[in-house]
Amino acid sequence: EARYLHWEFVDPDSIPVCGFEWIHWSVANLPIDALMYDFNDSHALAIPPDFSRQLPAMIPETVQGRNSSASKFLGRSADPAVIMRYNGPQPPDKDHEYYLQVWATKKPLPGLNQGFWLNELLHALRNSGEVPDTDGIFLTGKA
């Protein structure tokens, strides 16, 4: 039975705009129990408002990865509140199809610290010793 969630929220439609898929948010080792708002319904999960900014204080064992604002090609802020939190969609040219991919595992993924890179999450999933449950959805962001 899955006990931890991990996800990436990315923008493949940013590739023609900036030359790479924009990472908006990545999270690892979030205990599913921490999101349950109805303990009588194991599928009733909720993410509270401003979750990304509140997460370090609310659930310290959960780690957030760097978003694309951390890219050395952008010269943006080194502030963890900017580069290691949710970075909301702002399609600059047209509507974009964003992709949310979620994985569920029985155990937390080892070796991931605050500010991990997305490839480290993918390696940790592949090397976890289990086949994670996974699902994804495309979400449209309006220009």
Where in this protein do the model-derived segments appear?
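N-terminus-centered regions that define maturation/targeting leaders and the start
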Residues: 1-143
